[in-house]
Curated annotation (Swiss-Prot):
It comes from Haemophilus phage HP1 (strain HP1c1). This is Uncharacterized 18.2 kDa protein in rep-hol intergenic region.
Length: 163
């Protein structure tokens, strides 16, 4: 099983092979993210673990493509270190409330952060601003949180999405 860092490299190569990095727009990728996130919400609403697993992986893939498209290496580095970062923050009392959220609450919070991302994508220069790390942070963390709620590993979800 590949680690998250290797999976991100695989996603980047997969996206470049399909011209999704250079020949697509952040707006198109965001719409794709909304499609995949909608499938995740449907899987949660209908309690379909297979749909949840696939959708978590698909959302993650699109988030990586969005970050790569916008040359946001710092986001990709943070995402690739998500597993160890997740373990570190799960031990901090100040973040304990995040781990106590229910899946529905996580999804609602994710919608808020995705709205902020959409707002940034529609900015005047259509490129992501420096504070994008924080905007990307919650959706990526939420995918990890949701996968945990369903006893899934994020890496397994991403691997399944890649086939």
């Amino acid at each position: 099983m590949a680690d998250l860092q290797q999976l991100i490299k695989n996603i980047e190569q997969w996206a470049e092979d399909r011209n999704l990095v250079e020949d697509s727009t952040p707006q198109k990728q965001f719409i794709k993210l909304m499609e995949e996130f909608g499938e995740l919400c449907s899987g949660v609403a209908k309690n379909k673990p297979d749909v949840i697993k696939d959708s978590i992986g698909d959302c993650f893939v699109v988030m990586v493509i969005l970050a790569k498209q916008n040359h946001i290496d710092s986001v990709l580095e943070k995402i690739s270190d998500l597993d160890s970062s997740f373990e570190k923050i799960s031990d901090l009392n100040s973040f304990q409330h995040v781990f106590e959220l229910g899946v529905e609450e996580i999804i609602v919070e994710t919608v808020v952060s995705l709205g902020m991302l959409a707002s940034e994508l529609m900015g005047p220069n259509l490129e992501m601003p420096p504070q994008v790390d924080a905007i990307f942070g919650w959706p990526c963390l939420s995918l990890k949180l949701i996968s945990r709620k369903y006893n899934l590993m994020l890496t397994d979800c991403v691997q399944a999405a890649l086939g």
